[in-house]
């Protein structure tokens, strides 16, 4: 029996689905978020604040819901962060689209917005809107990120040129990350554990390759132990394999190891050949030859000081016996991932047993510091002291917990943190090129790599250097009226004159380092000057492909970084703007990228900043599609800090926080953050683009077909009918 239901694809249908998902994840957002209890069909109970785990645990029937969760999962596999924010932002975007296209007149919208809404409603096709979203992502977002948001970026590095990592900044980043994914009683401990692991595994020359290694092999680098408190979790030097020795022989001194991917014992015949036995005597002779050959190979390994044999396959009993006789420990049946991890750490190729016996030296061996069994709560493991040939220093994480489910949550959170750091420590190329025409090197045009179009950049600052925030009331009534108009028209927030005139920036904890070996009290500000200068610029306007082919001709230009200091009682400050240095040229082109290590204080700063600059762009844009997309995205961005501040009251509430931010931006004053945590700018950017891509997929759906099938009958394979 087959039944089907056909429904027209629409924003309203997608919004209804997204709102259900939003109701689930919004209650566990931020440090004040609660844990959600889920009961799976198997009877398993899941108690978690991890948005990705909650969404994957849901039993979803609606096709759009499954598609949204698939988009979230794809995003998490790359970035490890943002599942709950993904759903909230997507839901607010759908609300904005639905409100614009469904309402003829909205009293909260200005006349310009209503005109653009009618224009879009007349388009009558969602695919037109989806194309405008793609245009926004590739041609508008990157320019605003680099030209305006970059003025507020902080660096997690204590030295931006040498990329020296500041431990205190990393702790702030990790604490903010784990507070939304791990229980309140454990998130600081897990954050400290992660920070310790990071610095124990890294060398001074460590690069992005170490993050890639830990991300790719995180399952092999951690061990879960149930029945113990979380506080018993620790870091162990060396590699812990979740296997036991097939034979263990204690060894001292130099220990050499070999890796084999096939049986050491010779076979009767090789692949593709035939071995014929005509009598029992021939069989016995062949068996004796194999035994002698195996014994000779193991003796030869022993003579080369090989005391450990790592095997990805099951070895015959004869190999195990002669290994024990010759004092060689054997670990077998390792997974391909475990063997690959060992090979990447020590740079060792597999040992291939020779067809003809030889006394020559075995080249494929590696030194090991130690090789011993490790017992964790009555279970035996293999503990190896590998000598690394790469920038990664082998360490394993032992995660303890009373239940397996809690351990899995901590594993997911730690793995996601490494994914986040992997993206944070990479430069992110932006999809446009800026043109400078004046003597001061001021950027005037956005020239995009994927398009021949150029856009005039809106001017929103006077280029002055940051200054401390002062506890003063607003004296300029014109400025006050301008701020109120901005709030009413663009943000649907109505605040009285008294509230706006008398608000006082509140005190916040200062950002001070807590490590013992580093005393960095400032965070480096990465400004607009970190762009790359392209000498060979003329063909860029003629052929888009030249922008990539001339990448090797670009010259890195270093500039002195501004410093963000902490003023006692004033909170942590973000720079408002900075001046471009004189490049000494009348015309040049800059290919922009977001440098590694860019962060912002948590608490909705990224969303409020991008909201503000998008609205400024929309006011000066003459294309109705671009204006409407910018307005919708700008207003949807505020949905995230609204959820974060929903439990706050008074001067800590979202309206007051938003007023302070807008007033600071309009008066060219530094922003003051009420929280000390940090979050990755790269992660925020990737989240925004992932949501826009998901929304584009939703808007291109014309028809939703739900197919329901009756459960198929399961036949017993041993039934008489089948026999």
Swiss-Prot record:
Keywords associated with the record: ATP-binding, Cell projection, Chaperone, Cilium, Nucleotide-binding
Keyword ATP-binding: yes
Pfam families found in the cross-reference section: Cpn60_TCP1 (PF00118)
GO BP annotations, alphabetical order: chaperone-mediated protein complex assembly
GO MF term set: ATP binding
Keyword Nucleotide-binding in annotation: yes
One cellular-component annotation, GO: cilium
Location(s), subcellular: Cell projection, Cilium
InterPro entries reported in the protein's UniProt record: BBS10, Cpn60/GroEL/TCP-1, GroEL-like_apical_dom_sf, GROEL-like_equatorial_sf, TCP-1-like_intermed_sf
Similarity field: Belongs to the TCP-1 chaperonin family.
Role, per record: Probable molecular chaperone that assists the folding of proteins upon ATP hydrolysis. Plays a role in the assembly of BBSome, a complex involved in ciliogenesis regulating transports vesicles to the cilia. Involved in adipogenic differentiation.
Subunit structure, interactors included: Component of a complex composed at least of MKKS, BBS10, BBS12, TCP1, CCT2, CCT3, CCT4, CCT5 and CCT8.
Protein's name according to its UniProt entry: BBSome complex assembly protein BBS10
Organism taxonomic ancestry: Eukaryota, Metazoa, Chordata, Craniata, Vertebrata
């Amino acid at each position: 029996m087959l039944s089907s239901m056909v429904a027209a694809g629409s924003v309203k249908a997608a919004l209804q689905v997204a709102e259900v998902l939003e109701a689930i994840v919004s209650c566990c957002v931020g440090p004040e978020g609660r844990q959600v209890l889920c009961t799976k069909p198997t009877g398993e109970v899941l108690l978690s604040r991890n948005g990705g785990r909650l969404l994957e645990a849901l039993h979803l029937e609606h096709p759009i819901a499954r598609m949204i969760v698939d988009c979230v999962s794809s995003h998490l596999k790359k970035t490890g962060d943002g599942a709950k924010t993904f759903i909230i932002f997507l839901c607010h975007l759908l609300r904005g689209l639905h409100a614009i296209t469904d309402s003829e007149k909205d009293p909260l919208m200005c006349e310009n917005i209503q005109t653009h809404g009618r224009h879009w409603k007349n388009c009558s096709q969602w695919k037109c809107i989806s194309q405008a979203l793609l245009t926004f992502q590739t041609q508008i977002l990157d320019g605003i990120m680099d030209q305006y948001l970059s003025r507020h970026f902080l660096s997690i590095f204590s030295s931006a040129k040498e990329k020296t990592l500041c431990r205190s900044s990393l702790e702030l980043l990790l604490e903010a990350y784990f507070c939304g994914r791990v229980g309140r009683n454990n998130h600081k401990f897990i954050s400290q554990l992660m920070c310790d692991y990071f610095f124990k595994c890294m060398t001074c020359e460590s690069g992005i390759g170490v993050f890639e290694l830990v991300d790719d092999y995180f399952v092999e680098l951690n061990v879960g132990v149930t029945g113990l408190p979380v506080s018993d979790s620790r870091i162990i030097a060396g590699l812990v394999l979740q296997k036991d020795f097939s034979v263990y022989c204690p060894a001292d001194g130099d220990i050499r190891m070999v890796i084999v991917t096939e049986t050491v014992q010779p076979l009767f015949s090789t692949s593709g050949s035939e071995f014929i036995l005509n009598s029992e005597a021939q069989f016995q002779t062949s068996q004796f030859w194999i035994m002698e050959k195996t014994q000779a190979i193991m003796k030869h390994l022993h003579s080369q000081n090989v005391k450990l044999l790592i095997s990805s396959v099951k070895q015959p009993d004869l190999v195990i016996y002669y290994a024990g006789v010759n004092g060689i420990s054997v670990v077998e049946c390792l997974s391909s991932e475990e063997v690959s991890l060992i090979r990447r750490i020590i740079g060792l190729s597999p040992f291939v047993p020779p067809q003809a016996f030889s006394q020559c030296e075995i080249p494929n061996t590696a030194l090991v510091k130690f090789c011993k069994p490790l017992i964790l709560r009555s279970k035996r493991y293999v503990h190896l002291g590998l000598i690394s040939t790469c920038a990664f220093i082998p360490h394993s994480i032992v995660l303890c917990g009373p239940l397996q489910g809690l351990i899995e949550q901590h594993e997911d959170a730690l793995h996601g943190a490494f994914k986040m750091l992997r993206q944070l420590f990479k430069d992110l190329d932006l999809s446009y090129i800026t043109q400078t025409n004046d003597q001061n090197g001021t950027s005037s045009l956005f020239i995009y790599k994927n398009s021949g179009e150029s856009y005039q950049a809106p001017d929103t600052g006077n280029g002055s250097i940051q200054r401390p925030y002062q506890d003063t009331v607003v004296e300029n009534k014109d400025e006050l009226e301008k701020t109120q108009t901005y709030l009413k028209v663009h943000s649907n927030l109505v605040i009285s004159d008294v509230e706006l005139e008398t608000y006082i920036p509140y005190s916040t904890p200062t950002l001070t380092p807590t490590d013992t070996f580093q005393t960095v009290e400032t965070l480096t500000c990465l400004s607009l000057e970190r762009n790359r200068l392209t000498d060979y610029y003329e063909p860029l306007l003629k052929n888009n492909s030249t922008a990539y082919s001339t990448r090797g001709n670009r010259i890195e230009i270093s500039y002195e970084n501004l410093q963000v200091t902490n003023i006692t009682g004033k909170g942590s400050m973000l720079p408002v703007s900075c001046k471009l240095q004189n490049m000494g040229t009348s015309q040049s082109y800059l290919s922009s990228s977001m440098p590694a290590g860019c962060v912002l204080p948590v608490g909705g700063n990224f969303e409020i900043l991008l909201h503000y600059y998008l609205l400024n762009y929309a006011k000066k844009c003459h294309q109705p599609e671009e204006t409407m997309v910018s307005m919708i995205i700008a207003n949807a961005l505020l949905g995230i800090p609204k959820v974060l501040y929903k439990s706050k009251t008074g001067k800590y509430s979202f309206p007051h926080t938003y007023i302070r931010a807008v007033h600071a931006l309009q008066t060219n004053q530094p922003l003051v953050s009420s929280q000390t945590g940090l979050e990755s700018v790269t992660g925020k950017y990737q989240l925004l683009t992932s949501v826009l891509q998901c929304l584009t997929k939703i808007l291109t759906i014309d028809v939703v077909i739900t197919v329901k099938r009756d459960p198929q009958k399961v036949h017993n394979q041993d039934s008489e009918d089948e026999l």
